[in-house]
Amino acid sequence: MDSAPPPPRIFSRRRRLNARARMAHLRRDGTAVATVARELAADALDRLGFLNRAFSRVLVIGDVTGSFAAGLAGSDTITRADPCESLGEALDEERPLPGGPYDLIVSLGLLDTVNDLPGALALMRRALAPDGLMLASFLGAGSLPIMRAAMLAGDGDRPAPRVHPQVDVRAAGQLMTRVGFASPVVDGWGFDVGFESLDQLVGDLRAQAIGNVLADPGPPLGKAALARARNAFADKASEDGLVRERFEVVTLSGWNPAPRG
C-alpha cells in the first residue's frame, strides 16, 4: 500500500523562524507590541480557571510574553518552548515533542502557520499523559479583513499571494475528531485593534511574527500598488482617524483519552 503523500508546503520554515527571531530581538528592550500574544494568553488562563484543576507538568508553546506561565497556578513544572530558541526551548511542532508526557499542553498563536496541522495536533496528543489536556489558540478565518481587501486593491487585476490561508471553526472541529481527542471543544472569538495607517498595522504584525511566511510570498508591492493599498485602508477609518482591524481567534481543546478498564 502506498504511503500518504506529504502535506503541501504552504509555509516556509525558514521564513517562519526568521520572523520569530526578529520578534525575539524586538522584545529584548521590553517595548515591542504583543497585543495578540497577551489576548491569547489571557483567554487561555480564563478557560483553565473554569476547570478547577491543577496540572502538574505543563508544556506551553509560543508564550512570548511569559504572561501565561506567570499566571498559571498549581503546576510543579512549566516548560516554555518555541520554534525559535530565543523564545524558549527549541522545538518543531511537526516532530515528536520532547520531554513528555505532560498533563497540559498549550499552544499560543502558532498552529496557523504549520504545514501539517493534523500531524501537529496528533503529536501533541501523543505527548500528553492519559487524561491530559491540549489547549491551542491561533488566528483563524475572518482575521484582518480590511488589510486583505487593501492588499487586493493594491494588486488590482493581478493578485499575488500575500496573506495566509486561514482555518475556520468547522474545519478545526473536524480535525480534532479525526486526531482522536476526547470531548473536543472548538470555538471562535475575536477582538478589534485600532490603527492609524496600513504601515502601522503591517509593522505591528511583523513585530509579533504575524507577517508573511508563505513559501511563495509573491513579489513586493510596487510604489503605485502600495499607494492604492494605503488609500484603500485609510478609507475605512472612523471619525477618530483609526481603522479598526479584526482579529478572529480559533481555540481548540481536547483530552487524551485515558485507557479503559
Summary of predicted features, one role per range:
Residues 118-133:
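A short glycine-rich, Lys/Arg-flanked "PGG" loop and its adjoining helix->strand segment in the class I
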Residues 35-57, 67-70:
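Conserved alpha-helix/loop element of class I SAM-dependent methyltransferases that forms part
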Residues 93-105:
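A short acidic, Gly/Pro-enriched loop at the edge of an enzyme's catalytic core
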Residues 79-96:
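Adenosine-cofactor binding site in Rossmann-like domains, unifying the SAM/SAH pocket
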Residues 135-198, 211-219:
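Conserved catalytic/acceptor-binding region of the Class I
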